[in-house]
Amino acid sequence: MKTQFAILLVALVLFQMFAQSEAIFGAIWNGIKSLFGRRALNNDLDLDGLDELFDGEISQADVDFLKELMR
């Protein structure tokens, strides 16, 4: 039982290291891509993608949820 637990812990640590390194490598790669070419520079300055993040409509369910949080 102890060996299985130790193997599980080692596997979790290795998986976490892999997930974090993949994110770091992705950020580094995006940084390298943004250094080369005008397209990447123009894409970084394009703020139209931020319009999708804002939803101006609040549904009744959202209002009820906020009221529940504020109690």
Swiss-Prot record:
Q: Where is the signal peptide?
A: 1-23
Instruction: Give the subcellular location.
Output: Secreted; Target cell membrane
Q: In which tissues is it expressed?
A: Expressed by the venom gland.
Supply the residue numbers of the propeptide(s) excised during maturation. Answer: 40-71
Q: Which GO terms describe its cellular component?
A: extracellular region; membrane; other organism cell membrane
Q: Positions modified as Phenylalanine amide?
A: F36
PTM field: IsCT2F is an enzymatic proteolytic cleavage product of IsCT2 by the proteases present in the venom.
Chain positions of site Important for antibacterial activity, and hemolysis activity:
W29
Q: Which GO terms describe its biological process?
A: defense response to bacterium; killing of cells of another organism
Q: Which UniProt keywords apply?
A: Amidation, Antibiotic, Antimicrobial, Cleavage on pair of basic residues, Cytolysis, Membrane, Secreted, Signal, Target cell membrane, Target membrane, Toxin
Q: Name one GO molecular function term.
A: toxin activity
Q: What does this protein do?
A: IsCT2 shows weak hemolytic activity and antibacterial activity against both Gram-positive and Gram-negative bacteria probably by forming pores in the cell membrane. IsCT2 adopts an amphipathic alpha-helical structure.
What family name appears in the similarity comment? Belongs to the non-disulfide-bridged peptide (NDBP) superfamily. Short antimicrobial peptide (group 4) family.
Name of the featured protein: Cytotoxic linear peptide IsCT2
